[in-house]
Amino acid sequence: MQGTVNSERLKFDAEVGKVLKLVIHSLYTNKDIFLRELISNASDACDKLRYQSLSNQDLMDAGSELKIVISVDKDKNRLYISDNGIGMNREDLINNLGTIAHSGTQKFLDAINSGASSQQGVVELIGKFGVGFYSAFMVASEVIVESCKAGESVGYQWKSSGDGEFVISQLESDQVSRGTRITLALKPEECEFVDKFRIEHIVTTYSYHINYPVYFLNDKGEEERLNSEAAIWTKAKDEISAEEHQNFFRTVAHVGGEPWMILHNKNEGVIEYTNLLYIPSIKPFDLFHPDRKCSVKLYVNKVFITEDNVQIIPQYLRFLKGIIDSSDLPLNISRETLQNNKIIEKIKRSLVKRVLSELKKKAESNIEDYTKFWDNFGSVLKEGLCESMNTEFREELISVCRFYSTHSNDSLISLEDYIERMKPEQNNIYYLTGNDLDSIKKSPQLEGFVSRGIEVLLLVDPVDDFWTNVVTDYQKVPLRSVIRADEDLEKFSDVEKDDESKESQNEDAQSKEKVDKFISYAAQVLTNLVSNVRVSKKLTDSPVCLAVADGSMDIRMERFLREQKQLNYKSTKILEINSKHPIVSKMIDQYAENGENAVLCNMLHLLLGQACILEGEELQNVSDFAERMNNVLSQIN
């Protein structure tokens, strides 16, 4: 540290103590950021010199390297940050480091104390004060700034303990170098910040991609570089090699494999930002972990801000990896209060629109490749459909969703594909939810639809039970579960029964009375176990199935809510009976000939149990079910 002359003690505004207290104890929640702020200021100083040297080449020696150097003195518990940027003279030191004493300070405090100002308004007010520099007082009992402005030969020192005043002095030496050197006399409890590895971690985390090299001066007097050569996202698309993408992807994604998709865009509209985002080709193991956080890092002018405190990427796009860098966000204290930032919201909407647009292009151009993405992240993407407030991009989101169906075998289809294949008399998009594709294809619920050539979506992700209760239609075509769509089938001809003779139809009409009586008997036997018993129009091969009335909760959703202790009752379902099934047909004939008996009663209970098992419902009384089964089996001759 150099000697000084002509010292002058100046006072901050009377309220500066309150402001410093707010900055140190309230606005910054992470002490590490003091170094980020000082490095950012040093980078700005280098930027200013580079810009001004374009019009005045004498300010900067040809070929000289603009850089930032960090060094420590462990014995004195001191940390030094130096740059050879534009530097400051006496007037600059007073104005730049004394900005906090401007008349707006009291207004700022009034806004904080009254709570009348919006969070964003307060953030913008903070941006006027150069508060980032003062974050150094979180860790330092004294801050000393020595600086010499480019083109001048006299250097000055600014010194303060953050107690409401500062001292300005002239440096004695006439051999001062251009630039600025900040000395932090660290508090005893902050000795961790003279540790080289701690400093390297902070630089790597927050300042890895700034424009200028950041060096650490080691014990041997050697400068070790701590940051990257350049921010890859600042390059043009065609200047980034596949190897560079692969290396950066591994750095930000922490997953194996190659990126399935790369989204590199520079937005220069109302909001300026650059995004370099990757969609992995491998699903992360913790994709559905409840504590999983966003993996997209937010930068401001290549300075890392956060990846935790801001929802710049919605949860349903959490498979995205990479960075977003904006020059429209303030590079100051606002990084701690970005949650309700209007600029962030605009960037978020723009990104969502871009990502969904690129996914749609891929789905339409290469369904085989898109299927790989869908198998990994389709269930996550559909989470966006569950958000009742997320209506802005709902149509776009559904358009990139793909589904299995009774028509497509094992290939995926879009809802546009489904609508194009709808029958002329069909008014609904039909779907069925289940646990897996193999079992759902065998569901009795599908029989009547398949026999009539009506396509049904097969939804097998847990999230499907949720979004189908939020999204009611697509392109004005209602979505309808086959579990509650029995009555719809009357208007469709059964392709397997079109050759049925009028004689057979007359016989059916004559047997209707027997069927009705049996249905009434079944409803009486199963009183309190089901809400209704009716003849099914959807069953062709199975004897029975469960159904729910319109307006009732889906069976799987109700079961999920019960399991999560969010529902404390179990509703009674409708039992649908296939009167044409051989077993049921014999039961109808027996009842018509002999009336009620114990065997028929047991068989009705067993059929209800079968229907429950097929829908994944628990039997009310397993022992009773087994006893009835044994009684019926004992009747076999």
UniProtKB/Swiss-Prot annotation:
Keywords: ATP-binding, Chaperone, Cytoplasm, Nucleotide-binding, Stress response. It is found in: Cytoplasm. Its main location: cytoplasm. Gene3D superfamilies: 3.30.230.80, 3.40.50.11260, Heat shock protein 90, C-terminal domain (1.20.120.790), Histidine kinase-like ATPase, C-terminal domain (3.30.565.10). The keyword ATP-binding applies. Pfam families: HATPase_c_3, HSP90. Residues 560-637 are annotated as: C. Residues 336-559 are annotated as: B. The keyword Chaperone applies. Residues 1-335 are annotated as: A. Coiled coil: none annotated. One of its GO terms (molecular function) is ATP-dependent protein folding chaperone. GO terms for cellular component: cytoplasm. Homodimer. Belongs to the heat shock protein 90 family. Molecular chaperone. Has ATPase activity. HAMAP family: HSP90. This is Chaperone protein HtpG. The gene is htpG.
